[in-house]
Amino acid sequence: MSFPTHEQNGLVWLTSSLLSRYGQTVSHGFSTRKGGVSTPPWDTLNLGPGRGDSPEAVLENYRRFCGALDVPMERAVLSKQVHETTVRLCTAADAGKGLFASRDYTADALITRETDLPLVVFSADCGIMLLYDPVHHAAGAVHAGWRGCAAGILEKTVQAMADTFGSDPAAMVAAVGPSIGPCCFETDDDVPEAMTAALGAEAADLPEEELRRRCAAFAFSLRRGEGGSWILCCCGRPVGEEIRTERA
């Protein structure tokens, strides 16, 4: 499925049509390269602090992106990703961490029920999963690389929302953001070995569409219910001019 594209004052971002149905209670977006102030090689909408770009430029990029999404930049909570399975419950005490205060945690997944507390996760090649529980108004954002997926970060995030907020997986909605696709993702043996261990030995011989379906079911751990999951596929390489999805 394609991503609806939005533009405002030169800033371009993508959304999930599924999550947009809940736009009155939750805001979301997948950033692109367009619409920021960073100079090469970070041009232009670089949202990654501490990577050599001007801190002032990064803050201005956040001001623009958060403004487009109508969320408070000063309360954004940034993940500190290490390709592991830690899920952090974010509270008002975490507001601004990563931009205006140091991150005293490592976590590849963030969850919250706080209002006006934007959750920010980052991706190069990896997938991003956004979760929303419309019953309890709880949200989650997950950096879902192959290591994390194989280790169960997606299941752990869903379970953490169930344990913490009372979320029912059948009522949750989820969307996976743009990432590198199989056309461009060459791996060593460690990736197929890890994913075969997670998905089952027969996964190596499944047709692509069936494997995609099983990956979705495995990744989300969501039963078909009122919510359900929606996979949004977009390989970063063909759209590399717009989306930062490959590491240098």
Please place each PLM-identified region on the residue numbering:
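Active-site microenvironment for binding and transforming phosphate-containing groups
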Residues: M1-A248
